[in-house]
């Protein structure tokens, strides 16, 4: 058992079809030294946030398995939801949990890049970003899935620094049309919460 602990938090673009969600989450189960801690679907966002934690090698294996299953089951051409997204696995951060585990997270990012980078457009963000201007997930995700085809085929794009993936085959095809693109990175622990406000006026909310 490794003394290093990390987690990955893949966000998948499916929050309504329980059969698909369960199949994707199950793909991350059954690996020694890691566990799925939570899977939190949101029907309005049509998105599920999944947390996998354990030893670096095991978390990586589980994450790669999950991404592969999501690529198989999610078709972004059928997706709609309230949350910004650009792919079937929209974002997959690796998070260091123990002292010295940051480097293990960086290695995990490189392994995901090696596994999927020849078939899926992958953007690196956060601590794994290849330039300061690419650290922000929001900047990389601008235009979302619907704008991806034009973005990657020399269409209008406001910021050339963020236009292209860090790795990709370079040819827009059926797999890209189904999956979209994915952001992978390293970030600290993030605490997020949502509040429901009983108010119809956005300004008042």
Please annotate each region the language model reported.
Residues 2-205:
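Long, contiguous binding/interaction regions
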